[in-house]
A protein has these predicted regions:
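Short helix-boundary/capping micro-motifs
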Residues: 11-29
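A short LG(V/I)-centered, amphipathic sequence patch enriched
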Residues: 15, 41-60
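Central regulatory/effector-binding core of bacterial HTH transcription factors
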Residues: 91-154
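A late-sequence structural motif
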Residues: 106, 259-302, 309
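Hydrophobic hinge/microswitch elements
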Residues: 129-134, 138-142, 147-148, 201, ...
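Beta-alpha-beta core module
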Residues: 154-160, 164, 179, 229-278
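Flexible hinge/capping segments at coil-to-helix
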Residues: 156-193, 197
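Secondary-structure junction motif
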Residues: 176, 192-213, 281-285, 289, ...
């Protein structure tokens, strides 16, 4: 008879395509993993893996079993967590996918208090591009996603829970550093360090500049970088000026760059939490969702203060 543990072992082996890595993930020995896989193969009377030396790949039968195993293991986890929750415990493993700024500056702040409130919950946070986080949410590889834009799929529910201010920063020796503010058209005279197209910060800056009659193509781009921290440090080194999340500024370069007000330009990006509405949620997932979306969440209210004034 099948049991959830056997399928859990198969799932680890199928996802890693390496019995040794699967053993490390499960805190088992490699021979034990092999034995569980062989037991499953005997049960179904068909091979689940093709083995060639150290190379392993799934057979057609293994490919067919993979999504069913995910469902079975997930159901087993939910059963265990549900029964434990009847005793009042919020427990289980929480998987969160995050785009860059939420993952580095928001989620750790939220999880710190949430895990103190619910010590039987384990959490894993994966920081990646926004679209990748949403893809993992769609596939069920993470329970929740935090990102700077919503996906309008009918399969998802999104809730805005934070607004992240975006500031223009310049090197301390830049002519703008000593001024009270600049007019939008003066931006065309600067060398900019920009994020890549498609990220949340880029989109927020693009939309804001269009509101004052400036397109991104009009900006003089000195450098394009893949994360806000690198951009802030590049500004500190005098390479150019940049629009960056104030959370990044206050935690990384607050005293090493100058903030410049652009008249008529107020930039921010909304941060959302999303979940898949067709997948049953565990007690831990529901608790974290309620914790993030509640209006009196103290850590969120602290984050919503202008970081450079806090």
């Amino acid at each position: 008879m099948l049991d959830a543990h056997q399928l859990h072992v198969f799932l680890a082996a199928a996802e890693t395509l390496n019995f040794s890595l699967a053993a490390k993930r499960l805190h088992m020995t490699q021979p034990s993993v092999s034995q569980h896989v062989q037991t499953l193969e005997q049960h179904f009377n068909t091979p689940l893996f093709l083995r060639s030396g150290r190379h392993v790949e799934l057979t057609d039968a293994g490919q067919a079993l993979l999504p069913l195993s995910r469902e079975m293991v997930s159901l087993s986890v939910r059963i265990d967590e549900t029964m434990r929750s009847l005793k009042g415990d919020v427990c289980g493993h929480l998987l969160v996918g995050c785009s860059t700024t939420p993952g580095k500056y928001i989620v750790p702040h939220l999880l710190a208090e949430f895990l103190r409130m619910h010590p039987h919950v384990q959490a894993s946070c994966y920081v990646m591009a926004r679209q990748n986080a949403l893809q993992l949410l769609s596939k069920g590889d993470v329970h929740l996603a935090l990102a700077s834009a919503r996906d309008f799929s009918r399969d998802f529910e999104f809730h805005k829970f934070l607004s992240d201010a975006i500031a223009l920063i310049v090197p301390l020796n830049h002519p703008w550093a000593s001024r009270d503010g600049i007019d939008p058209e003066e931006l065309l005279d600067a060398n900019f360090i920009l994020r890549e197209e498609g990220c949340g910060t880029y989109n927020a800056v693009r939309d804001g500049l269009l509101g004052v009659g400036i397109s991104m193509d009009q900006l003089r781009t000195a450098l394009t970088l893949g994360n806000s921290e690198a951009i802030a440090l590049a500004v500190q080194e005098g390479i150019g000026v940049a629009f960056v999340s104030e959370m990044v500024v206050t935690r990384l370069v607050k005293d090493s760059v100058a903030l410049v007000q652009v008249r008529g330009l107020d930039l921010s990006q909304d941060i959302y939490i999303g979940r898949h509405i067709h997948r049953p949620a565990t007690a831990a997932q529901n608790a974290f969702w309620e914790y993030v979306t509640t209006t009196n969440n103290r850590p969120l209210r602290e984050l919503e203060k202008t970081p450079l004034e806090a």
